[in-house]
């Protein structure tokens, strides 16, 4: 039994599910149980996964329609046992915004954009700063006058131009996520969701 207090459950678009999931050696979940938003904010959610075989991890994560892991918010090792295993995952921010922060900005961007005392182009993509630095902020480099992130519109967001068009800025960023289409899709879906989540 996996128990947690989850914030941001209902921020995910329909192409994703927030789940308690069991994984073997593949990024595709072997077992999943959908987590629904609690009736009251701050109310614990409990999920029971049963009948699991050939599993080595249990997670609270977002998966796509193919049950492929997109963002992990909590993970614990799992070994098969006869008794019920009780796990308290604590309080977790499982919002799509935090998913983008953890899965994209923290892993692929902050090395140049704020992990030290310096941020390239003065753009800090670190936790607590990224959304304010991006959402609704005019780009100083867009010839078309685009916003860095235009709420609800990935096509009008200069961030997506930078990540998909080599000529968008002086330093080519295309190779950063070109081999990670799930992350590009997550960014697009986050931008589309902003209008409804603000």
Segment roles from a protein language model:
Residues 1-45, 51-198:
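Aromatic- and Gly/Pro-enriched helix-to-coil junctions and flexible linker segments
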């Amino acid at each position: 039994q996996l128990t947690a207090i989850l914030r941001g459950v209902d921020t995910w678009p329909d192409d994703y599910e927030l789940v308690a999931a069991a994984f073997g050696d593949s990024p595709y979940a072997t077992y999943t149980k959908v987590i629904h938003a609690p009736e009251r904010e701050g109310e614990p959610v409990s999920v029971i996964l049963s009948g699991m075989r050939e599993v080595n991890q249990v997670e609270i994560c977002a998966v796509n329609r193919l049950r492929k892991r997109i963002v992990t918010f909590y993970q614990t090792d799992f070994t098969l046992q006869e008794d019920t295993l009780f796990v308290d995952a604590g309080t977790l921010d499982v919002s799509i915004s935090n998913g983008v922060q953890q899965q994209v900005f923290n892993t692929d961007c902050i090395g140049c954009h704020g992990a030290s005392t310096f941020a390239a182009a003065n753009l800090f993509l670190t936790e607590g700063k990224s959304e304010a630095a991006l959402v609704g902020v005019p780009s100083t480099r867009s010839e078309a006058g685009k916003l860095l992130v235009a709420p609800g519109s990935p096509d009008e967001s200069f961030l997506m131009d930078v990540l998909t068009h080599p000529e968008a800025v002086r330093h080519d960023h295309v190779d950063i996520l070109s081999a990670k289409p799930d992350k590009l899709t997550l960014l697009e879906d986050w931008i589309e969701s902003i209008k409804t989540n603000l």
